[in-house]
């Protein structure tokens, strides 16, 4: 009798302690709400980590620039002119004209990529020759994390539309290591002789940056943006382009191939501030007659703006509200209009 009563009491306690279906649904709903509240915070924390890693990349690139400057007494050229077999005196007209090694290739020995620089032997090999050499080309196609922004998840493993031809005019392939960081070329459109730190055969010294190294941009971000089915006109040589137009981020090693005689061609490693440009502008490409999307910097997938390396090697974040005029003044190294105050 006593045992039977005790079992009934325990049974009632067990039934009372169990969840009802309604209670279970309430618990699930509460968990869902908590996840919904926490997820944005988790995503924001992850993006903060990616932005920090991106900033560290830019600082290391800035250190590479200054190590080069300490060794050579000048900053590396935006890109080095290469004369083709039938070029005229300017090194750009005629078959075989090429854009040679770009700024990124010159600082490799002063970063963690010294072995890549040794493989390429840039002092004795042109960029076109390296691309046609199996061993050197393989080195140029390896992913280089120090040149990539972790927030740009849209980028491919390598550039596929550089169309860099060798001296014989034969396409030498694709897949070259891309870079999310481009060098400041001009306060207007991209140009062979821009007013920024990096242009064709540039030899900018610290003393040339009269606006101040803390008030001059050296490098900035540029995301990969792929717009398919766009038809436009190359403003440099009036060749009509159609199909997949890709204003990609940049290339670690070189500027574009035989079209580098126009400002349209040197966009692969250099950035500028043409009319209509600005931080994360334009958000879409209309046509190459606009020319802005292919050349504008800076752009990123960091919420609210993009990061730049200043000429003194420091890194700073620029918001999307930063005006085009301010960005242009920050790119020009000696326009006599140094930007002051909070920008």
Q: How would you describe each model-predicted region?
A:
Residues 1-21, 85-88:
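N-terminal leader/signal peptides at the extreme start of proteins
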Residues 4, 22-25, 46, 339-343:
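Enriched but not universal
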Residues 5, 38-41, 46, 69, ...:
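Structural motif corresponding to the C-terminal cap of alpha-helices
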Residues 5-8, 19-23, 35-37, 268-271, ...:
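Intrinsic-disorder/low-complexity peptide segments enriched for small residues
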Residues 7-9, 46, 285:
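Intrinsically disordered and other compositionally biased segments
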Residues 10, 28, 253-256:
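N-terminal non-cleavable signal-anchor helices
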Residues 16-50, 60:
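N-terminal single-pass transmembrane signal-anchor helix
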Residues 48-343:
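Surface-exposed loop/linker segments characteristic of extracytoplasmic
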């Amino acid at each position: 009798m006593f045992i039977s009563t005790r079992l009934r009491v325990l049974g009632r306690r067990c039934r009372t302690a169990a969840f009802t279906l309604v209670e279970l649904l309430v618990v699930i709903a509460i968990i869902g709400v908590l996840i919904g509240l926490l997820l944005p915070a988790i995503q924001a924390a992850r993006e903060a980590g990616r932005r920090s890693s991106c900033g560290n990349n830019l600082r290391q690139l800035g250190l590479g620039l200054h190590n080069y400057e300490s060794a050579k007494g000048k900053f590396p050229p935006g890109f080095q002119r290469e004369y083709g077999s039938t070029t005229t005196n300017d090194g750009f007209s005629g078959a075989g004209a090429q854009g040679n090694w770009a700024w990124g290739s010159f600082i490799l020995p002063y970063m963690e990529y010294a072995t890549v620089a040794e493989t390429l032997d840039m002092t004795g090999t042109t960029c076109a020759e390296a691309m046609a050499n199996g061993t050197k080309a393989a080195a140029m196609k390896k992913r280089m994390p120090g040149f990539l922004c972790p927030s740009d998840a849209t980028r491919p493993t390598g550039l596929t539309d550089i169309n860099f031809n060798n001296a014989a005019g034969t396409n030498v392939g694709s897949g070259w290591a891309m870079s999310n960081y481009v060098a400041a070329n001009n306060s207007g459109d991209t140009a062979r002789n821009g007013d920024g730190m990096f242009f064709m055969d540039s030899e900018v010294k610290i003393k040339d940056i009269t606006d101040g190294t803390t008030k001059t941009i050296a490098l900035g971000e540029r995301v990969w943006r792929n717009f398919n089915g766009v038809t436009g006109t190359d403003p440099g040589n009036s060749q009509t382009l159609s199909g997949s137009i890709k204003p990609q981020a940049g290339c670690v090693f070189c500027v574009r191939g035989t079209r580098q005689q126009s400002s349209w061609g040197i966009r692969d490693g250099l950035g500028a501030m043409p009319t209509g440009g600005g931080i994360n502008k334009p958000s879409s490409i209309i046509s190459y007659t606009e020319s802005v999307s292919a050349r504008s910097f800076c752009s990123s997938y960091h919420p609210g703006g993009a990061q730049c390396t200043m000429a003194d090697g420091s890194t700073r974040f620029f918001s999307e509200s930063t005006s085009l005029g301010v960005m242009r003044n920050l790119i020009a190294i000696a326009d006599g209009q140094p930007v002051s105050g909070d920008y």
